[in-house]
């Protein structure tokens, strides 16, 4: 703690590491991360609510993208792994 301000110094703490996604993991889309992304600017703004509520299942992982299957009769989608979080 800094003596002058009484705040915790975060520079000494280790960086937060996001759990690496694996095939079969249950996930959902993080609304805040997705809405601030380049992909959201290029896509329809009226997204279905179920992608934010989850769960979706990771089917494949290629580079920075994951193929996600939702538990609904809809096509599988490829999402940037930065935009999805564990359910």
UniProtKB/Swiss-Prot annotation:
Its EC number is 7.1.1.-. It is a peripheral membrane protein. It is found in: Cellular thylakoid membrane. NDH-1 shuttles electrons from an unknown electron donor, via FMN and iron-sulfur (Fe-S) centers, to quinones in the respiratory and/or the photosynthetic chain. The immediate electron acceptor for the enzyme in this species is believed to be plastoquinone. Couples the redox reaction to proton translocation, and thus conserves the redox energy in a proton gradient. Cyanobacterial NDH-1 also plays a role in inorganic carbon-concentration. GO terms for molecular function: oxidoreductase activity, acting on NAD(P)H, quinone or similar compound as acceptor; quinone binding. NDH-1 can be composed of about 15 different subunits; different subcomplexes with different compositions have been identified which probably have different functions. It comes from Prochlorococcus marinus (strain NATL1A). It comes from the Bacteria. The lineage of its organism: Bacteria, Bacillati, Cyanobacteriota, Cyanophyceae, Synechococcales. Residues 1-10 have a biased composition (Basic and acidic residues). HAMAP family: NDH1_NDH1O (MF_01354). Keywords: Membrane, NAD, NADP, Plastoquinone, Quinone, Thylakoid, Translocase, Transport. Belongs to the complex I NdhO subunit family. Residues 1-26 are annotated as: Disordered. It catalyses: a plastoquinone + NADH + (n+1) H(+)(in) = a plastoquinol + NAD(+) + n H(+)(out); a plastoquinone + NADPH + (n+1) H(+)(in) = a plastoquinol + NADP(+) + n H(+)(out). GO terms for cellular component: plasma membrane-derived thylakoid membrane. This is NAD(P)H-quinone oxidoreductase subunit O. InterPro entries: NdhO.
